Curated annotation (Swiss-Prot):
Keywords: 4Fe-4S, Cytoplasm, Iron, Iron-sulfur, Metal-binding, Pyridine nucleotide biosynthesis, Transferase. One of its GO terms (biological process) is 'de novo' NAD biosynthetic process from L-aspartate. Iminosuccinate binds at residues 57, 74, 163-165, 184, 280-282, 297. It catalyses: iminosuccinate + dihydroxyacetone phosphate = quinolinate + phosphate + 2 H2O + H(+). This is Quinolinate synthase.
């Protein structure tokens, strides 16, 4: 085990390839046993104390989540980052867009002023931890779609809404155009906010969350055309479809929740009489419509927590979370809804190896994999995020 320095030098951000520029190269960490990695992670946590805040998303592996200070879903983690006070560094055990959001919210002007001008650094243990859904909507595509639809509708009356599972550039787009960010926790409240301010909503990048939420507001499927960014004209729609729309949905989805099917629900109800189906609203409509309960990651956790012993559940969300709920609630019968493994592969990239490597470089004065959003993007993203945080 490496001897810990008696003082912590000021951390310096790296440039270029972080794995090359790091004081401690990544490669030697790959051969360490998990027990050794865990000991070294805890040693750094103890040394840095309140100066370090490790945030973990519920989809993380158990071996990673046990080393986090706070855990939550996208919405909860956004609030945690916004409220950070004493810490100097946030290490985000999640994916890239989450770390971007943490950088924006933790470094709001009022927060920086309260810290006498000091920023909070945000680190992502593995820069390859992205999000396939977020990648389905590039800013150039969204801007092109906005320009195209402006030929047939008044975009001054369109409120753009981006799911928090999106790049900071899309959040900034919403900020510039009077729009807002949403999460699966507050999607309905956000859509209500939007319809108070415009005639239509342009919802991206997850079509399923947008559709499932809008259906609870008496908006019909026919009023929700899907915009395909690769279609030749008008996102694959007629002018009339766009003109008669209430919500224009982006053709994007979560690759995990897309895997769940109505036939999975039917099978469990047939084989396990009395079982309840609990799903995330990122699931397709065919699943969401026939589930007993649909809700955010936070709602899924609370639903299980508040259910009596003996309750039977089949849960349609990320595998690591379902397995953790099963372990934490042995008094209930919990099943994974799909016969196919539905795991967030990019979230899985955050492991003990990368976490230990990140922390020991931080301890010894080097920031690796720092996430820092540029000032212009931060400015407009923050506007959209603050609108979201103000929605009740």
């Amino acid at each position: 085990m490496v001897d810990l320095p008696t003082t912590t030098p000021p951390a310096q951000p790296t440039t270029g390839n972080d794995e090359v520029d790091a004081l401690h190269p990544l490669k030697p960490y790959r051969s360490l046993e998990n027990e050794v990695l865990q000991q070294r992670i805890e040693a750094v946590r103890q040394e840095l104390g309140d100066e370090l805040l490790i945030l973990g998303h519920h989809y993380q592996q158990d071996e990673v989540i046990e080393h986090t200070d706070l855990r939550g879903d996208s919405y909860q983690l956004s609030e945690m980052a916004a409220k950070s006070q004493a810490c100097r560094t946030i290490v985000f055990c999640g994916v890239h867009f989450m770390a971007e959001t943490a950088d924006i919210l933790a470094n709001r002007p009022d927060r920086i002023e309260a810290r006498d001008g000091r920023r909070v650094d945000v680190l992502l243990p593995d820069m390859a931890a992205g999000c396939s859904m977020a990648d389905m909507a590039a800013i150039a595509q969204v801007e092109a779609a906005w320009a195209d639809m402006s030929e047939v509708i008044d975009t001054e009356q369109v409120i753009p809404v981006t799911y928090i599972n999106s790049a900071a550039s899309l959040k900034a787009f919403c900020g510039r155009h009077g729009g807002i960010v949403c999460t699966s926790s507050n999607a309905r409240a956000v859509l209500e906010w939007a319809f108070e301010r415009g005639q239509r909503v342009f919802f991206f990048p997850d079509q399923h969350l947008g559709r499932n939420t809008a259906l609870t507001m008496d908006i019909t499927e026919e009023q929700m055309p899907v915009w395909d960014p690769y279609a030749l004209e008008m996102g694959g729609n007629t002018d009339e479809q766009i003109q008669s729309s209430r919500v224009i949905l982006w053709k994007g989805h979560c690759s995990v929740h897309q895997m769940f099917r109505a036939e999975h629900v039917d099978r469990f109800r047939k084989e396990h009489p009395g079982i309840k189906i609990l799903v995330h609203p990122e699931c397709p409509r065919e699943v969401n419509d026939i589930a007993d309960v649909s809700g955010s990651t936070g709602k899924i956790i609370q639903t299980i927590k508040n259910s009596p012993a003996g309750t039977k559940w089949a849960i349609g969300t990320e595998l690591h979370l379902v397995n953790r709920l099963k372990d934490e609630h042995p008094e209930q019968e919990i099943h994974f809804l799909s016969p196919v493994v539905c795991m967030c592969a990019t979230m899985y990239r955050i492991d003990l190896t990368h976490l230990c490597w990140t922390l020991e470089n931080l301890r010894d004065g080097r920031l690796v994999n720092q996430i820092r959003v540029d000032e212009e993007t931060t400015k407009w993203s923050l506007i959209a995020l603050e609108r979201m945080l103000a929605v009740k």
